[in-house]
From Swiss-Prot:
GO terms under biological process: glycine biosynthetic process from serine; tetrahydrofolate interconversion
Keyword flag Amino-acid biosynthesis: yes
Pathway note: One-carbon metabolism; tetrahydrofolate interconversion; Amino-acid biosynthesis; glycine biosynthesis; glycine from L-serine: step 1/1
GO CC annotations on file: cytosol
Name of the protein this chain belongs to: Serine hydroxymethyltransferase
Binding residues annotated for (6S)-5,6,7,8-tetrahydrofolate, in chain numbering: L123, G127, H128, L129, E248
UniProt subcellular location: Cytoplasm
HAMAP family the record matches: SHMT
Organism: Anaplasma marginale (strain Florida)
């Protein structure tokens, strides 16, 4: 018999990877994780994703697979679909997309032809790469037209959206964003889409957990089709879903996902999605969503009171976007300084940004992950003051910046020690 090392622990077989995992757990446990697209999943979600379902190949859909032995994974996928539809009150759902980008591409494949016109939010005003950005396939395969925000308010300019739609006659309009902190008027977008005979795609990747928790407007009843990732405010594994109330669109989506763009689904991830959807259906998730929103609003208020420029003047979501141009520093400089101080966020373009994407004039902060850790209003007030201290020091030279980083790091240590991420299972050999 050929020797098989399948029963050897990772710490014994591959210490390099094991040590990296252990170090990453320590990093997550000892720094403030303020990246808006990240969250902390539960022990149950981790257990599902790390299960033996990773061994099972299951091309096709529940009840119609190309492989035998799929009866049990069919149960899991059906649970995920049923729970997702119940969570958002929709009729049809596909839980197989591997990522949000792929989910959007699968919608394009289902509803569009190469060369069709799409209308989405510009990248610098808060849109996503898949909404028509030039380097992305959405900007290469389609005639991409972009709408933006009002220069004075930072809010989506619906008059511009309508004018562009009437002029460009898009086949698809995308309502959604990756760094837009305010509410999106899905009803207004649908009215514009109807005027030009376009499909409306709502990309709620960032907002889905808040929508599930009743803290952000729902696109259902307005959008023809809805996509979302499952790992941001929804607090599930990394992956995505596509939802609709239209059976004909659902049929097209099914074919677009498989066999159009994917082969075998990741059944261990779908199991983790099912677990996360059950968690989101629990009444406590509404309390979580409410706390996420309250924490982000407190954070925005403190940052504003400390003299920083909060884009749109506040937030209606988990996202707080800072414009650093008045401080004479870049997003790259400030995000690096904050990380040294123990606060992890990301550099981010702000409306009408003239800096390169790898530099930017802003930073994006999010409240979802640290709310999952258990931080509340008092802690987010402290975080706001700590962020402001670092930002203000960045414009005062290296010595003052280093001193501020050291001082803030000590305070961050106190915050995270009080609320360790005890839900995370740690492998003994790691």
């Amino acid at each position: 018999m050929v020797g098989y090392i399948g029963n050897v622990d990772i710490g014994v077989f591959d210490a390099e990877v094991a040590n990296s995992i252990s170090a990453e757990l320590e990093r997550q446990n000892t720094l403030l994780q303020m990246i808006a697209s990240e969250n902390f999943v539960s022990r149950a979600v981790l257990q599902a994703q790390g299960s033996v379902l990773t061994n099972k190949y299951a091309e096709g859909y529940a009840g119609s697979r190309y492989y035998c032995g799929c009866a049990l994974v069919d149960v899991v996928e059906n649970l995920a679909v049923e729970r997702l539809c119940r969570l958002f009150g929709c009729k049809f759902a596909n839980v197989q997309p591997h990522s949000g980008s792929q989910a959007n591409q699968q919608v394009f494949m289902a509803l569009l032809k190469p060369g069709d016109t799409i209308l989405g939010m510009s990248l610098d005003c808060g849109g996503h790469l898949t909404h028509g950005a030039a380097p992305n396939v959405s900007g290469r395969w389609f005639n991409a037209v972009s709408y933006g925000v009002n220069r004075d308010t930072g809010l989506i300019d619906m008059d511009e959206v309508e004018a562009l739609a009437l002029s460009a006659k898009p086949s698809l309009i995308i309502a959604g964003a990756s760094s837009y902190p305010r509410r999106i008027d899905f009803a207004a977008f649908r009215a514009i889409a109807d005027k030009v005979g376009a499909y409306l795609l709502a990309d709620i990747a960032h907002y889905s957990g808040l929508i599930a928790g009743g803290c952000y407007p729902s696109p259902f009843g307005h959008a023809h089709v809805v996509t979302s990732t499952t790992h941001k405010t929804l607090r599930g594994p990394r992956g995505a879903v596509i939802m609709t109330d239209d059976e004909e669109i659902h049929k097209k989506i099914r074919l677009s996902v498989f066999p159009g763009m994917q082969g075998g689904p990741l059944m261990h991830v779908i199991a983790a999605k099912a677990v996360a959807f059950k968690e989101a259906l629990h009444p406590d998730f509404k309390l979580y969503a409410q706390q996420v929103l309250e924490n982000s609003r407190v954070l925005a208020g403190v940052l504003s009171s400390e003299g920083l420029d909060v884009v749109t003047g506040g937030t209606d979501s988990h996202i707080v976007l800072l414009d650093l141009r008045s401080k004479g520093v870049t997003g790259r400089e400030v995000s690096s300084s904050l990380e040294r101080a123990g606060i992890v966020c990301n550099k981010n373009a702000v409306p009408f940004d003239t800096e390169k994407p790898w530099v930017t004039s802003g930073i994006r902060l999010g409240s979802a992950a640290e709310t999952s850790r258990g931080l509340g209003v008092p802690e987010f007030e402290s975080i706001g003051r700590l962020v402001a201290k670092v930002v203000n020091a960045c414009s005062l030279g290296q010595e003052k910046m280093s001193a501020a980083e050291a001082e803030v790091r000590r305070e961050v240590n106190g915050l995270v020690r009080s609320l360790p991420m005890s839900a995370f299972p740690v492998c003994e050999v790691c």
